[in-house]
Amino acid sequence: MKKTTQGGHTSHPILSALVAIIVVALIVCAYIVLGPGPTNFAGGRRVELSAYQAQDPTGVPAELKSASLVERGEYLTRAADCLVCHTAEGGAPFAGGRGFVLPFGTLYSTNITPDVESGIGGYTDANFLDAVHKGIGRHNTKLYPAMPYASYTYMSDADALAIKAYLFTLKPVHAPAPANSLVFPFNQRSLMSIWSLLFNPDRRYEPNVERSAEWNRGAYLAEAMEHCGECHTPRNLFFALNNRQKFSGSVQGGWRAYNITPDRSSGVGAWSDADLIHYLSIGHADGRGTASGPMGEAVDESLSHLKPSDISAMVVYLRSVARVATADLPEPKTNPAPSSPADGMAANADSHGKAVYEGACAGCHGWTGVSPVIAFATLTGTRAVNDPTANNVAQVIIRGAQRHTANGADDMPAFGDAYSDAEIASVANYVTARFGVTGSQLTVAHVAQLRAQD
């Protein structure tokens, strides 16, 4: 029904409401699309690399500057963490085929060995740069952002081509990637052109002249190479990184990538530099935790191969990012649990979780949470057991964990086949109640979902 105003004009309430909704939607979209870049938090003046007067933050560290192109490319391939994503379980290195379960389907990584038919053997330098920087494969194929080209876009041309030079020395493996299984509209690759237009700046790293050379090196490694934000930064409605919440944590592949901002309670603000250096270098820091899942892979195949100067530079950079609190993560409990299993918190009335823990876990992890066997197995003070979701605790129980050290490998066996979803939920809830700030309420259904990430 139309209403007539005093001026004789007719108003349309429905139309007015629709216009208001559209305006609000446009404002929200603009807010999302016009988000800050990964290093904007630092302020200061950025310049093109060619105009930067201090030490070049790109390339390899000083001790490798005289190495051959292929040797430099091998180091940078490690720094870019290519192997993990492009190797299927039991498959040939770099031959692709690893599946990534996403909310809208499953994507498979591609073959990046120099096989001409199924790999990158036919790629020119220009083709390779397009893939790394723009998400455009050979024959103009649009790549999905599971390939982190929105981070790799900051990689210098020289570094990208050094990686290509190394990859082309590998043995060609004929291994076509399995077909992706994505629901509509995500199965329409053409939409990636729009996504890239909105969220991929296609811009190389620009050093910040008001920050130190070490900071710039750390920024380049964390953003352009190691692409830390791809796991540790939440995503917006369009699956792009939300840098307003930079490094505040996210869930990737069923694993929780925790807050790595300087927040003291929920991030790494209470960690010493030595803690961070040890964790990044070997995947463990006493009293802080042991890397597992995707972070464990990143340490094993990438971070542990970096020179100490590069690890230190990354720590300098991590210390500088904006502090963001994660609401559901309390400051970890650092005091051990009682030495007697009869004392302390019990997760559930029937003590089923306690029984499972006693039979399978206590021998290595102890009743106090401080391992009587090896420091890597200590639970006290770790983020995972203080996470009220118990997500990563359950994942480690299901899949196990392995840390590679100078003295060999330290393993925690996988119990996914040995215990039911109900048993895993019970023992995970017991662990968080006994050793963490508060007990979790992990459900059988959640454990089943975690299993499905295979």
Spans of model-derived segments:
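Short cysteine clusters
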Residues: 82-85, 228-231, 361-364
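Short extracytoplasmic
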Residues: 50-80, 376
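N-terminal type II signal-anchor transmembrane helix
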Residues: 4-46
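Flexible coil segments in periplasmic/lumen-exposed cytochrome c-class electron-transfer proteins
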Residues: 39-56, 60, 87-107, 138-219, ...
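Extended, polar beta-sheet/loop recognition surfaces of beta-rich domains
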Residues: 280, 380-423
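C-terminal structural cap/anchor segments
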Residues: 349-390, 395
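Alpha/beta-hydrolase active-site loop signature
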Residues: 119, 368-371, 404
